[in-house]
Amino acid sequence: MKLRNVLIVVKDIEQSKKYYHDLFGLEMLLDNGGNMILSEGLVLQEEECWKDFLQGDVLLRNNHSELYFEEAEIESFVDKLERLYPETEYVNSLTTHSWGQKVIRFYDLDGNLIEVGTPA
């Protein structure tokens, strides 16, 4: 068995595709209408489709998981994030852990938690 993808729920799939391309360089590989596979194994699922599958509500900002990215030039990434998406809601600003790794945590446009850190 092999883990193939990670799926996150989004309200506007086109807006989210642009967001993940702008910030992380992810490209669309397949558009299934309401479900979109991006490079690096990230899948965007429209909220209404997901609600139909689950037959229930989607819990935003649940902090049960996060998408983790690594970026050696993290200060440049933070500048880009602030320039392109100034309304970003931060969980924590750029911080340095005791072991020397720099990280930042924030929510995407739909409340999915993202962490960006320098390589360990």
What name fits each language-model region?
Residues 1-3, 59-64, 97-98:
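Short glycine-enriched loop/turn motifs at secondary-structure junctions
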Residues 1-15, 65-67:
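N-terminal beta-strand motif that seeds the catalytic metal site of vicinal oxygen chelate
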Residues 8, 29, 92-96:
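Short beta-strand-to-loop elements that line the ligand-binding cleft
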Residues 13, 67-113:
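Vicinal oxygen chelate
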Residues 14-26:
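Amphipathic alpha-helical segments
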Residues 17, 36-37, 45, 88-91:
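A generic "structured core" feature
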Residues 25-31, 87-91:
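Short secondary-structure junctions
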Residues 27-62, 113-118:
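Conserved short beta-strand elements that form part of the metal-binding/catalytic scaffold
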